[in-house]
């Protein structure tokens, strides 16, 4: 799994999302993670996390939710702000616009919020 457009489309088009809309969200995420002020939550971090996710596929309840949570988990990064909540809200908005199933959106939001210090790290384990 990587951050390429083809992989993103494979995940997001599975529920019938419009390709152009999927491409626009992907471009937004790539731009966010490529910003010059990114030192840790950048594209290399996302690619690394996606690679790790591929190694634990058999231990994950919903791999699509995990992939999406990885892509969105810290896409919004503002110093001194609740980045997990902001990123979860953004993911919810964008995935809803892409017509993702509500249950999937809720899992993605829960996974993103689990990255907050003190969050539930077992939210997607089998």
Model segments located where?
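Conserved N-terminal diphosphate/IPP-binding helix and adjacent helical/loop segment
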Residues: 1-46
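Alpha-helical phosphate/pyrophosphate-handling elements in metalloenzyme active cores
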Residues: 35-66, 90-99
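Structural motif
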Residues: 20, 58-62, 120-124
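His-Asp-centered metal-binding catalytic motifs of divalent-metal-dependent phosphohydrolases/nucleases
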Residues: 49, 64-78, 87, 110-116
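Histidine/acidic-rich helix-loop-helix segments that form or flank divalent-metal centers
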Residues: 101-126
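Post-HEXXH active-site segment of zinc metalloproteases
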Residues: 82-92
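A generic structural signal for short coil/turn motifs at secondary-structure boundaries
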Residues: 37-38, 77-81
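Short runs of predominantly hydrophobic/aromatic residues within well-ordered alpha helices
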Residues: 22, 26, 46, 63-68, ...
């Amino acid at each position: 799994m990587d951050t390429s457009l083809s992989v993103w489309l494979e995940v997001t088009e599975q529920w019938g999302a419009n390709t152009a809309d999927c491409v626009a969200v992907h471009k937004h995420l790539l731009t966010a993670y490529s910003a010059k002020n990114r030192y840790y939550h950048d594209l290399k971090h996302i690619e690394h996390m996606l690679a790790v996710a591929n190694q634990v596929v058999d231990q994950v309840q919903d791999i699509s939710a995990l992939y999406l949570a990885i892509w969105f988990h810290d896409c919004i990064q503002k110093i001194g702000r609740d980045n997990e909540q902001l990123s979860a809200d953004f993911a919810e908005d964008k995935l809803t616009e892409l017509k993702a199933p509500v249950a999937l959106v809720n899992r993605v939001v829960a996974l993103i919020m689990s990255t907050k210090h003190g969050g539930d790290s077992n939210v997607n384990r089998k």
